[in-house]
Amino acid sequence: MKIDSLLKEDSVLKKEINFKASKKKLFLFLRQFSILLNAKIPIIEIINLLKEQKEFKQLKPSLDKVSENLNNGLSVSESFCGDKNFDMFFTSMMKLGEESGRLDKVVYDLSKYYERTYDINKKIQNAMIYPIILTVTGIVMLIFMLKNVIPTFVDLFESSDMVLPLSTRILISVSNAINEKGLLILIILVLIIAGLIIAYRKTKFGYYLDKFRTTKSIFGKQRKIVISSEIARSLSITHKNSMTILDGLIIIQKSMKNKYYKQELSDIFKEIESGEYTLEEAFNKRKITPQVFNSMLKVAENTGELGDIFEKLSEFYDGEVEYAIKSFISILEPMLIIFMAIIVGFIVISITIPMFDVINSFN
């Protein structure tokens, strides 16, 4: 299978869609696609049938284009190529299915692949709900206090003509800034966030940030497990459908969102392609996957049972993701609570100390 040709097609056919369908819609679409393929219904009829279903409303603009491409004589993989709803991994697997004459099996395997991916992402999202609510609630309460509560004490403190503690002066300055220049501060924050997003996407900043988050941050271990699960799952499905290791790696590399891993996988591909290292040696050198992952790769190469090992790795690390998520939350929640307690404590102390001084002065 020639990956280079598919990369060129993806670039040429690249287009904009107003929105991107969820992974859930994608695996449900593939599940029905697989059933209809097994029923020997022509592909163009399958696409036309599925695009009219309400549950695939988000996919309809994309499927309209796929239908048009098929009618214009393009192959199945070419018809899906270039659409943001169908990534490089998806179109590469479809091309493999066409070339091998096993499109029905590939589509079924893809439906299971995206279903497992969706399940993992959903678990991560569900685990983040409480920390997000905690953070948002804390920010809203802090802004409310700075805008409405603190100013009521300012007049009292100023009328007492007393020397305020440093913490109180800082608190009053922040409160005044929020009240007087709140809109300007908000605009600056939005510009900073937008600048960071652009820098992440367009410059080396994205690579170094992802490298730090994966190798140096307190949550690096959990992040490494999640990405290792993704790599193992992808290697499993590509090898199961007779794709070479090199072709599988380049597709995984092109589909990888983490910029640090994207570069590391590119280097691994080059080292294996040149014959400089074996698969296990290249991964072990880079240290981007856990040692257990690398050890199982070595066993796979020694025994020739790559398919079985990839499948076991996939199942193992999909399970490890749940423990990684629980570990992540067990660290994050206390950190958030402690941080909020420090902020609240700072505000309380900054208000109560001068309040006692005011009361004493009256006495």
Predicted regions and their residues:
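Membrane-interfacial amphipathic helices
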Residues: 1-27, 31-34, 209-223, 291
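Junction motif at the cytosolic side of a transmembrane helix
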Residues: 197-216, 275
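Membrane-cytosol interface motif
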Residues: 162-172, 210-227
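Membrane-interface starts of transmembrane alpha-helices
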Residues: 56, 87, 180-181, 185, ...
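Bilayer-spanning, highly hydrophobic alpha-helical transmembrane segments
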Residues: 119-170, 174-200, 319-363
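Glycine- and small-hydrophobic-enriched helix-loop-helix hairpins
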Residues: 23-123, 220, 224-328
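General membrane topology signal spanning transmembrane segments
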Residues: 1-5, 163-172, 247-251
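Alpha-helical membrane-embedding segments
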Residues: 184-204, 240-256
